[in-house]
Amino acid sequence: LLLSTCVALLLQPPLGALGASLEPEYPGDNATPEQMAQYAAELRRYINMLTRPRYGKRDKEGTLDFLECGSPHSAVPR
């Protein structure tokens, strides 16, 4: 069982093949305009993927405020 697990982990494709984008490689200073345009497009997609908003995650401050306000043990202002 352990041996088969190790073999399965070793045979997995690299992260880039699983959908996780790898940073595009700079084509060099002597690249053609077409190569630079392709690099710019790939870099833009890569940056957009890294900076996309993460929906469904709460910030800790907002969650803590909500929990404190709804607590029956919180002090009532007079």
UniProtKB/Swiss-Prot annotation:
InterPro entries: Pancreatic_hormone-like, Pancreatic_hormone-like_CS. Residues 1-19 form the signal peptide. It comes from the Eukaryota. One of its GO terms (biological process) is feeding behavior. It is found in: Secreted. SMART domains: PAH. Transmembrane segments: none annotated. One of its GO terms (molecular function) is neuropeptide Y receptor binding. Keywords: Amidation, Cleavage on pair of basic residues, Hormone, Secreted, Signal. Belongs to the NPY family. This is Pancreatic polypeptide prohormone.
